[in-house]
Amino acid sequence: MNVLSYFTWFVHLSSVLEWLNIIYFFLLYTKLKKNLSLKTFIFSFFISFCSALCACTLHFFNNQSFYYFLINLQSFLTLFANITLYFSILIYKQQILKNQNY
């Protein structure tokens, strides 16, 4: 765990806390607006949160070679999260346009 400086750990851990906060606030906002299409964003955010956990786990164990699979997992999760975020935006946009037509 001594490989990274305290400031780098601060950035990594604040990123994880940031994802938890955005997921929580999006859950509240979804309940407030009663719009189910917003829940697709939460799925994408959760995948990004898991990606951040991969980075923290790898660094926590001093980048040991046994945990190098986490690098590929983090890359895949980031890609998958970005793709799901794109489709979440499309779903939400479609929902907005549908509501405007009524």
Swiss-Prot record:
Belongs to the ycf49 family. This is Uncharacterized protein ycf49. It comes from Cyanophora paradoxa. Keywords: Cyanelle, Membrane, Plastid, Transmembrane, Transmembrane helix. The gene is ycf49. The keyword Plastid applies. The lineage of its organism: Eukaryota, Glaucocystophyceae, Cyanophoraceae, Cyanophora. It is found in: Plastid, Cyanelle membrane. GO terms for cellular component: cyanelle membrane. PANTHER family: NUCLEOLAR-LIKE PROTEIN-RELATED, YCF49-LIKE PROTEIN. The chain crosses the membrane at residues 9-29, 41-61, 71-91. InterPro entries: Uncharacterised_Ycf49.
